[in-house]
UniProtKB/Swiss-Prot annotation:
Pfam families (alphabetical): Synaptobrevin (PF00957)
GO MF terms held by the record: SNAP receptor activity; SNARE binding; syntaxin binding
Entry-linked PROSITE patterns: SYNAPTOBREVIN (PS00417), V_SNARE (PS50892)
Membrane topology of this protein: Single-pass type IV membrane protein
Annotated signal peptide: none
Intracellular or extracellular location(s): Cytoplasmic vesicle, Secretory vesicle, Synaptic vesicle membrane; Cell membrane
Similarity annotation: Belongs to the synaptobrevin family.
Expression (tissue specificity): Not nervous system-specific; abundant in cells of the gut and Malpighian tubules.
Region spans: Disordered: 1-30, 133-152
Protein name: Synaptobrevin
Transmembrane segments: 111-130
Oligomeric form and interacting partners: Part of the SNARE core complex containing Snap25 and syntaxin.
Biased composition (Polar residues): 1-16
Length: 152
Protein backbone atom coordinates (compact mmCIF):
# COMPACT_ATOMS: atom_id res chain seq x y z
CA UNK A 1 0.00 0.00 0.00
CA UNK A 2 1.22 3.45 -0.84
CA UNK A 3 0.94 6.44 1.39
CA UNK A 4 -1.68 8.04 -0.85
CA UNK A 5 -4.10 5.13 -0.64
CA UNK A 6 -6.84 4.89 1.91
CA UNK A 7 -6.48 2.18 4.58
CA UNK A 8 -8.23 -1.07 4.05
CA UNK A 9 -11.37 -1.74 5.99
CA UNK A 10 -9.91 -4.86 7.41
CA UNK A 11 -7.56 -2.78 9.48
CA UNK A 12 -4.35 -4.29 8.19
CA UNK A 13 -2.60 -1.04 9.06
CA UNK A 14 -0.89 -0.89 12.44
CA UNK A 15 -2.94 2.06 13.62
CA UNK A 16 -6.60 2.79 13.06
CA UNK A 17 -6.08 6.38 11.82
CA UNK A 18 -6.43 7.18 8.13
CA UNK A 19 -3.37 8.20 6.23
CA UNK A 20 -3.37 11.90 5.35
CA UNK A 21 -2.15 13.27 2.07
CA UNK A 22 1.29 14.87 2.17
CA UNK A 23 1.44 18.59 2.97
CA UNK A 24 1.44 20.88 -0.01
CA UNK A 25 4.74 22.03 -1.34
CA UNK A 26 5.95 25.28 0.30
CA UNK A 27 6.28 26.94 -3.10
CA UNK A 28 2.71 25.97 -3.98
CA UNK A 29 1.52 27.50 -0.67
CA UNK A 30 3.34 30.75 -1.41
CA UNK A 31 1.86 30.92 -4.88
CA UNK A 32 -1.66 30.22 -3.63
CA UNK A 33 -1.65 32.42 -0.53
CA UNK A 34 1.23 34.84 -1.19
CA UNK A 35 -0.58 36.80 -3.88
CA UNK A 36 -3.64 36.98 -1.63
CA UNK A 37 -1.51 38.17 1.31
CA UNK A 38 0.21 40.78 -0.86
CA UNK A 39 -3.18 42.04 -2.04
CA UNK A 40 -4.42 42.11 1.56
CA UNK A 41 -1.26 43.96 2.63
CA UNK A 42 -1.71 46.52 -0.15
CA UNK A 43 -5.36 47.04 0.78
CA UNK A 44 -4.45 47.35 4.46
CA UNK A 45 -1.68 49.82 3.65
CA UNK A 46 -4.08 51.81 1.48
CA UNK A 47 -6.64 51.92 4.30
CA UNK A 48 -3.89 52.85 6.74
CA UNK A 49 -2.75 55.66 4.46
CA UNK A 50 -6.32 56.91 4.07
CA UNK A 51 -6.82 56.80 7.82
CA UNK A 52 -3.50 58.58 8.37
CA UNK A 53 -4.53 61.25 5.86
CA UNK A 54 -7.82 61.73 7.72
CA UNK A 55 -5.96 61.91 11.04
CA UNK A 56 -3.56 64.48 9.57
CA UNK A 57 -6.51 66.50 8.30
CA UNK A 58 -8.21 66.38 11.70
CA UNK A 59 -4.94 67.35 13.42
CA UNK A 60 -4.60 70.32 11.06
CA UNK A 61 -8.17 71.41 11.74
CA UNK A 62 -7.64 71.04 15.48
CA UNK A 63 -4.46 73.14 15.31
CA UNK A 64 -6.36 75.88 13.50
CA UNK A 65 -9.16 75.64 16.08
CA UNK A 66 -6.70 75.84 18.98
CA UNK A 67 -5.06 78.89 17.40
CA UNK A 68 -8.48 80.50 16.99
CA UNK A 69 -9.35 79.74 20.62
CA UNK A 70 -6.07 81.29 21.78
CA UNK A 71 -6.67 84.38 19.62
CA UNK A 72 -10.21 84.62 20.97
CA UNK A 73 -8.92 84.35 24.53
CA UNK A 74 -6.39 87.11 23.88
CA UNK A 75 -9.05 89.34 22.32
CA UNK A 76 -11.36 88.71 25.28
CA UNK A 77 -8.56 89.66 27.68
CA UNK A 78 -7.92 92.88 25.76
CA UNK A 79 -11.65 93.60 25.67
CA UNK A 80 -11.89 93.05 29.43
CA UNK A 81 -9.00 95.45 30.02
CA UNK A 82 -10.63 98.06 27.78
CA UNK A 83 -13.93 97.61 29.61
CA UNK A 84 -12.16 98.17 32.94
CA UNK A 85 -10.51 101.31 31.59
CA UNK A 86 -13.84 102.60 30.26
CA UNK A 87 -15.51 101.90 33.59
CA UNK A 88 -12.76 103.80 35.42
CA UNK A 89 -13.05 106.70 32.96
CA UNK A 90 -16.84 106.76 33.38
CA UNK A 91 -16.45 106.88 37.16
CA UNK A 92 -14.03 109.82 36.91
CA UNK A 93 -16.37 111.57 34.47
CA UNK A 94 -19.30 111.08 36.84
CA UNK A 95 -17.32 112.55 39.76
CA UNK A 96 -16.18 115.55 37.71
CA UNK A 97 -19.72 116.10 36.40
CA UNK A 98 -21.05 116.14 39.98
CA UNK A 99 -18.42 118.67 41.06
CA UNK A 100 -19.17 120.85 38.03
CA UNK A 101 -22.90 120.65 38.71
CA UNK A 102 -22.42 121.83 42.31
CA UNK A 103 -20.07 124.60 41.16
CA UNK A 104 -22.57 125.81 38.56
CA UNK A 105 -25.40 125.63 41.10
CA UNK A 106 -23.44 127.88 43.50
CA UNK A 107 -22.55 130.27 40.68
CA UNK A 108 -26.23 130.43 39.72
CA UNK A 109 -27.20 130.99 43.35
CA UNK A 110 -24.65 133.84 43.69
CA UNK A 111 -26.02 135.44 40.53
CA UNK A 112 -29.59 135.19 41.84
CA UNK A 113 -28.53 136.76 45.17
CA UNK A 114 -26.70 139.60 43.38
CA UNK A 115 -29.71 140.24 41.12
CA UNK A 116 -31.99 140.20 44.17
CA UNK A 117 -29.80 142.73 46.00
CA UNK A 118 -29.68 144.98 42.91
CA UNK A 119 -33.48 144.77 42.59
CA UNK A 120 -33.94 145.71 46.26
CA UNK A 121 -31.52 148.64 45.93
CA UNK A 122 -33.30 149.89 42.80
CA UNK A 123 -36.66 149.56 44.53
CA UNK A 124 -35.38 151.56 47.49
CA UNK A 125 -34.00 154.25 45.16
CA UNK A 126 -37.30 154.50 43.31
CA UNK A 127 -39.31 154.64 46.51
CA UNK A 128 -37.06 157.31 48.02
CA UNK A 129 -37.24 159.49 44.91
CA UNK A 130 -41.02 159.27 44.64
CA UNK A 131 -41.83 159.63 48.32
CA UNK A 132 -41.53 163.13 49.65
CA UNK A 133 -38.85 163.50 52.15
CA UNK A 134 -39.73 164.25 55.77
CA UNK A 135 -37.55 167.41 55.78
CA UNK A 136 -39.70 169.07 53.10
CA UNK A 137 -42.93 168.66 55.05
CA UNK A 138 -41.53 170.18 58.26
CA UNK A 139 -40.18 173.46 56.80
CA UNK A 140 -43.52 175.09 56.36
CA UNK A 141 -43.24 175.46 52.67
CA UNK A 142 -45.44 172.53 52.16
CA UNK A 143 -49.18 172.43 51.75
CA UNK A 144 -50.78 174.98 54.00
CA UNK A 145 -54.42 175.29 54.32
CA UNK A 146 -55.51 178.65 53.13
CA UNK A 147 -58.11 180.14 55.28
CA UNK A 148 -59.69 183.41 54.37
CA UNK A 149 -61.74 185.56 56.48
CA UNK A 150 -65.15 186.23 55.15
CA UNK A 151 -65.49 189.68 53.67
CA UNK A 152 -67.34 192.06 55.74
Amino acid sequence: MENNEAPSPSGSNNNDFPILPPPPNANDNYNQFGDHQIRNNNAAQKKLQQTQAKVDEVVGIMRVNVEKVLERDQKLSELGERADQLEQGASQFEQQAGKLKRKQWWANMKMMIILGVIAVVLLIIVLVSVWPSSSDSGSGGGNKAITQAPPH
